[in-house]
Amino acid sequence: MLPLPTLAQSLLEAGKTDVGVLYIDSESVNTVKKDGKYYLAFFAEEKYTDQTFLASLRQGEDMQNAVSAITLYLFNTFGNEYIIGANYIVDSEGKVCADLGADMTPVDARNNATMRNAYTMALKILQRKSKQ
């Protein structure tokens, strides 16, 4: 699978979330094959902006400096569902505060404009990479 990236210089804003802003790491966009299926994979960083959420999150053990989440998203070939290959809470230096693991339960992305945009952006990046 893909390694946990350092906080990349290649973050592109995909949109707002309930508690922050989602950025995709354009350098991490790739295709992967898992269990016989192909996925569009990329790391994304959700930078938390909701102060109430941050205050609550920082109550946890080793979470005092948490500022964002780094997540490995794997979208199906249609872009309507994704699974989470890895999920980490990190501090401002990119150090892992918590490893939240993977979630292989498919999530419907059709009604989430930010996730649909993230998929579309990643797909365009992959298309550009393939032309180089």
PLM segments and residue spans:
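N-terminal signal peptide c-region/cleavage motif recognized by signal peptidases
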Residues: 3-5
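N-terminal secretory-pathway/extracellular module detecting exported/lumenal segments
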Residues: 7-70, 74-132
